[in-house]
Amino acid sequence: MNHLIVTVGDSFSGRKFDLEVPKDVESEKLLDDILETLRGYAPELQWRISEVALWDRRLGRMLKPGETLEEAGVWNGDTLYLAQK
């Protein structure tokens, strides 16, 4: 399986979205894609990639720039939060 289903939460508004994401894309590219997708669901969420990072609840850490979900150890069903850098 080349994709994971993750819940992406906006830690500021409390909203959550389930998304299917590729596990082999670097976290910064994935974050940019997630922000673009969330703007379609919730236009009021106007986060810039320079302001936020992806934080994995189960792992208890931010994903590193250049790290893929697979390299980070993100599992299917994990919750990723948009967290302020």
Language model regions located:
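Ubiquitin system architectures
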Residues: M1-K85
